[in-house]
Design a protein with these regions (language model features):
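Internal alpha/beta domain cores that form substrate/cofactor-binding pockets in large enzymes
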Residues: 4-6, 26-31, 59-78, 83, ...
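Short alpha-helical
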Residues: 12-13, 70, 91, 143
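Solvent-exposed polar/charged
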Residues: 23, 54, 76-77, 98, ...
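N-terminal Rossmann-like dinucleotide-binding module
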Residues: 2-41
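Positions that flank functional sites
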Residues: 36, 68, 140
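Donor/substrate-binding cores of folate-linked one-carbon enzymes
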Residues: 82, 86-196
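N-terminal beta-loop-helix "entrance" segment that forms/cooperates
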Residues: 36-56
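Amphipathic, non-transmembrane alpha-helical secondary structure
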Residues: 15, 19-22, 72-76, 94, ...
């Protein structure tokens, strides 16, 4: 069964998960950060997620602030079953978290509760971790504090860099999200608390 989804994400890391959603579910809209000026010509550059959305003619929203009333009203009108968030880059207010019936599901690039917040991939490499991975979780008001649903692990190579690990994890994240959505739909998703 296809879920009606809104996708929120910005950098290249988020693109494989968006692609997986497009391939297996119905993506009603994509939300990403505003375009950035690049270089001296001040040409506007689309975030990678927007480029992918445009390729598939999916409506794109780029609010300066996700807590803008007008934007939240738009999301309520769209009324998705689920909102999937991957490296979006803004904190979401409760008024957004409460819209979808299956909640807002975040794909995070670490094995939570380790490496909450920014740069989890870089930190795993810098700290010499033997393994890291992806966690899917329910979003709450705090930063990366919500209940976890699924995890997938990856072992770091001797020569692992943040770049090589990033590329592994972004593919793993797309796969794990699809599994998580299946569980949400079947009612088999188990919420696990993050025990600090």
């Amino acid at each position: 069964n296809k879920m009606r989804a809104v996708f929120m994400g910005t950098p290249e890391f988020a693109v494989p998960t968006l692609q997986a959603l497009i391939d297996h579910h119905e993506v009603l809209a994509v939300v990403t950060q505003p375009d950035k000026q690049r270089g001296r010509g001040k040409k506007m550059q689309f975030p990678p997620v927007k480029e992918k959305a445009v390729e598939y003619d999916i409506p794109v929203y780029q609010p300066q602030r996700a807590r803008d009333e007008e934007f939240i009203e738009e999301l309520k009108k769209i009324n998705p079953d689920v909102i999937v968030v991957v490296a979006y880059g803004q904190i979401l207010p409760e008024s957004i978290l409460n819209i979808p019936k299956y909640g807002c599901i975040n794909v995070h690039g670490s094995l939570l509760p380790k490496y909450r917040g920014a740069a989890p991939i870089q930190w795993a490499v810098l700290d010499g971790e033997e393994k890291t991975g992806i966690t899917t979780m329910y979003m709450e008001k705090g930063l990366d504090t919500g209940d976890m649903i699924d995890k997938a692990e990856v072992v770091l190579d001797e020569k692992e860099t943040a770049g090589s690990l990033h590329d592994k994890l972004m593919v793993l994240g797309a796969d794990l999200l699809l599994e998580t959505l299946k569980k949400l739909e079947d009612g088999t998703a188990v919420r696990k608390k993050q025990n600090d």
